[in-house]
Amino acid sequence: MRLGISSYCLCPNLRDGKMTIFDVIRWAADHDCQHIEFVPFYLDFLANPELIDRVREACSEANLPISTYSLNADLLKPDLEERRAEIQRVKTHIDVAHRLGLTKMRHDVASFRRPMSSNTPQNFMKEFPLMVEGVRELADYAASYGMTTTLENHGFFVNGSDRVISLLEAVDRKNVRMTIDVGNFLCVDERGENAVKKCLPYADMIHLKDFYIRDKVRLAGVGGLFDCDNGSWFETVGGSMLRGAILGQGDLNIWKILGDVKHAGYDGDISIEFEGMEPCEAATETCLRTARTIWEQV
């Protein structure tokens, strides 16, 4: 197992101009990360293609492998022309991942695009053929580079373990795997302690995070649909409220989850993905320390 961070952990500092992406790379290396994952937030590779090479070279100089590149996407746009444009956009990011020297990349299927009222089993089944078609096309494109694509339980619509597994089975491509986010199952009111174990046979990457879980009535005037920014309360499909926490300090049983991961023999990459309200550098450092301690003891 290799433990590292997603650049998402330090996005508040990137946003506020306190760090550059090269500072993030150095921070990860200085904190003994064994890999780094990139997300294209405050990191516009498409507008600045030479940045791809600079980032790859900086990671090489820091002896910090790049594990993956993770992208929000919506392959279910209602208009055919828009769907084709979105698939082409994801393909350009697969090109980026290849230029970074990667063998895998995560893309979403339907990130944060549907109100709760349309997030139904009926609509999921109705749109299922489009999902399969889009994921297959992107997987086949990635295969031309020898790359694997991964789907994450993310974005509310393709979020529960059964939905993700059903899609993976229907796509039926050897180079399509899963990024398991241990916390995101809570967005659809599924406990990660149960869902992670079910999804482990499909895993090619794990995002490690924690959440506080509260009843909505206790949090008047906060949160909203898809208001998932660092430190914000946001609503689940079932009406509970979540907020990002420092690993091990929230309401997920991280000990059980990491124990299940370790005892299943998972030997891939794990990324810390901190999205709480605490200062991001100190919080991410605590998350790394906590993950290492738990992994050693479970």
Predicted regions and their residues:
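Boundary/entry segment of secreted carbohydrate-active catalytic domains
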Residues: M1-T20
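Catalytic domains of carbohydrate-active enzymes, especially glycoside hydrolases
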Residues: T20-F41, G101
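Active-site acidic/histidine proton-transfer and metal-coordination neighborhood
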Residues: R26, E57-E61, P65, K77-M178, ...
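Acidic/histidine-rich catalytic cores of soluble enzymes
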Residues: H35-I36, I66-Y69, V132-D251, R292
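Conserved, mostly hydrophobic/aromatic
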Residues: I5, A28, I36, C59, ...
